Amino acid sequence: MSYLLDPSRKTITIPKLQAMRDAGEKIAMLTAYDSSFAALLDYCGVEMILVGDSLGNVMQGQQTTLPVTLEQMAYHTECAARGNQTSLLLTDLPFGTYPTPEAAFASAVTLMKAGAQMVKLEGGDWLAPIVKFLVERSIPVCAHIGLTPQSVHALGGFKVQGKTNAGAAQLKRDALALQAAGAQVVLMEAVPAALAGEITQSLTVPTIGIGAGADCSGQVLVLQDMLNVYPGRKAKFVRNFMDGQTSIEAAVRAYVAAVKDGSFPAAEHTFSA
């Protein structure tokens, strides 16, 4: 399944993302776990498609991402890759699959062969040697800092990170260390907006935020969250883009437009220290 794309739509590459960041053009990212939604996101102009281990929550009904396996991530990556034509497709390395540089490389190769163009790893400055090992072996990396869902039990729940002076200083060290190790993108989750802005200014690579304020180079949401698939309580950083729309395509286009013009995230979607 594929859409007839606008001829002006160019393939999104890592240099293109860097150029967007340097020019101040916002980057839109959403999750997709299958061919049909990947094709739709690509058609709607989403620059980055994340095959996230969030599939454990939204596809499998798990309470955390921890049960998701590498084989499951590879399967969903294959599905999404078949629908994608021009967006940059990145995939999460699931919990427990990157304890050492060698193990991380083997896991990343599995995902790259399945169609990923970049892998995402969760962790702080301790992750730098693993990132360096991957990048030196032609595996592009997005480093995920702040609230790292794979560490939910160690963190004591899904809590905002970097609210104390010590926590903020550590996140700054994490970001710089991971960039120095070769990470081409840094994703920040549930980080006070002012801190995320400072980190973005301190880096030269693009930053992607989810609950990290409007000053990041781009934004990401879980597709099912922004489509309001789930009733009830939602994370503070989620906005219902189906509100007022008559189709999923229209909702996705509204999200892309809101990211591009800076109206999302608004103040109500962000955290303070």
From Swiss-Prot:
Q: Could you tell me the EC number(s) of this protein? A: 2.1.2.11
Cofactor note text: Binds 1 Mg(2+) ion per subunit.
Alphabetical keyword list: Cytoplasm, Magnesium, Metal-binding, Pantothenate biosynthesis, Transferase
The main location class comes to cytoplasm
* Superkingdom as given in the UniProt entry: Bacteria
Listed disulfide bonds for this chain? none
**Which Pfam family name is an example for this entry?**
Pantoate_transf
Q: Give the metabolic or biological pathway.
A: Cofactor biosynthesis; (R)-pantothenate biosynthesis; (R)-pantoate from 3-methyl-2-oxobutanoate: step 1/2
Annotated 3-methyl-2-oxobutanoate binding lies at D53, S54, D92, K120
* Reactions mediated catalytically: 3-methyl-2-oxobutanoate + (6R)-5,10-methylene-5,6,7,8-tetrahydrofolate + H2O = 2-dehydropantoate + (6S)-5,6,7,8-tetrahydrofolate
Q: Summarize subunit and interaction data from the UniProt record for this chain.
A: Homodecamer; pentamer of dimers.
| Summary of the function given for this chain in its UniProt record | Catalyzes the reversible reaction in which hydroxymethyl group from 5,10-methylenetetrahydrofolate is transferred onto alpha-ketoisovalerate to form ketopantoate.
- Protein family according to the UniProt entry: Belongs to the PanB family.
- Protein name, UniProt field: 3-methyl-2-oxobutanoate hydroxymethyltransferase
